[in-house]
Each structure stands twice: as C-alpha cells, then as structure tokens.
C-alpha cells in the first residue's frame, strides 16, 4: 500500500513477491506521492505506471490472465478477479509497448517531463498519454492508446 515516504507490506506475503512489491510501492513515491491522480476514476495513472516501473527495473515480464480490457474505466467497473490483471498487468504491458515503439530514451524523457510538469498536482491519464504521444513521431494516440482508452479518444 502506498503512503508518502512509507511502504506497507503485510505479513504473510510470499518471499518471491517481495522484490516486485517493494519496487511497485517505491514507484508509488513518484507516481502517487509526487504526481497525484484520482485513484478511483483513473487507476491506470498510478497503478499501471508503478507496475511498469517495477517490472522494468527488475526485468520481470508477465502476461495477463484476463482478456484484453479497457484501461479508461474506474475501479468500480472491473471485476474483482480482473482489476489487477487489466490495470496493473495489461496497463504496465501497454506502457512497455509504448517504450519499445518510442525508444527508451524518448519514453523515459517523456515520463520525466510529465512528472516534472505535474509535480504536486493531480494529473490525468490523458495528460500522461499525451506526453508520451508528443515525444514521438509515431501516432501512439491512434495506433496504441485509442483502442484501450476509447473514453479519452
């Protein structure tokens, strides 16, 4: 669970998950603590980014166990079974696809620029996607984001 400057990991967590959980919750220090969002209506903005950063740093890859879903819905719109799979895993994988298509240098520069521009503010998913899209000549909005975020495109 994220909280500024503090990571909460409950007892009983499998030791094989500790590295990922510590990485994910540390990423929340930037993507929730530094750049806020509306976690209920736009969970992608911090959960998918935190998942992506943790998995990227640790070199972890994972496919989702749920069918491909929309990433622009509120937490209340997903089943309990697929919320984590869609928002965290599919969302993180979508960001990794954006990184691969843009190139790592452009991706990380865009993410840093977005974080700097939204420091201590409430950011939106659309502002994040727009920052990534603006950092590449590839039309990510049309080719990658629109199918998963129809409410925003």
Where are these regions (language model features)?
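Membrane-embedded glycan transfer/ligation machinery
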Residues: 20, 51, 96
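Post-HExxH zinc-binding segment in Zn-dependent metallohydrolases
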Residues: 4-7, 12, 41-74, 138-144
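Active-site-adjacent structural elements in folded domains
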Residues: 15, 76-82, 115
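Amphipathic alpha-helical substructures
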Residues: 84-153
